[in-house]
């Protein structure tokens, strides 16, 4: 990708990369703090923490790809953001992953219909067979915005690649 991107695209890739590395790093620090302050660490708890660390490591991986302007950087970054768009809890299972900033709007249907808002930096909620009465869904508006930004970048990269390729036709 390096050979056919403008300074503007490279600047945006750098910003996206730093954002994802920042979010992943904050998430890892939160997990380390949770492990350090946990009163009881069982094998299952450690396994869950390692599972969560994989998500934040993936965010750092995506950011690194962006900084190195790798061809698959934007594809991986979209995947990373899609994982962050929707958080939910239903029948004892909950999943809510955010690496970076979040601004959420959600519905809590546990006891009644309640509109929720949230904001912060990096979070992870994972429950398996726990809080079975909990029923909620959250939408991360920041992740939506980042996906939109990445899609614009993808289009711009494709356009620039086509311009470079067509301008090189006939040159030898």
Model-assigned labels for residue ranges:
Residues 1-172:
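Topology signature of small-to-medium multi-pass alpha-helical membrane proteins
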């Amino acid at each position: 990708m390096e050979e056919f991107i403008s300074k503007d695209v490279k600047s945006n890739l750098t910003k996206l990369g730093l954002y994802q590395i920042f979010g992943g790093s904050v998430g890892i620090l939160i997990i380390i703090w949770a492990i350090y302050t946990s009163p009881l660490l069982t094998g299952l708890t450690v396994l869950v923490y390692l599972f969560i660390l994989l998500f934040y490591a993936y965010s750092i991986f995506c950011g690194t790809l962006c900084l190195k302007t790798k061809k698959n950087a934007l594809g991986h970054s979209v995947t990373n953001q899609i994982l962050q768009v929707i958080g939910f809890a239903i029948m004892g299972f909950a999943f809510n992953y955010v690496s970076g900033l979040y601004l959420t709007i959600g519905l809590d249907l546990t006891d009644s219909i309640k509109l929720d808002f949230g904001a912060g930096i990096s979070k992870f909620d994972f429950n398996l067979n726990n809080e079975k009465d909990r029923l909620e869904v959250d939408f991360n508006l920041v992740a939506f915005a980042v996906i939109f930004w990445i899609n614009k970048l993808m289009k711009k990269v494709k356009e620039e690649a086509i311009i470079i390729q067509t301008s090189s036709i006939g040159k030898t």
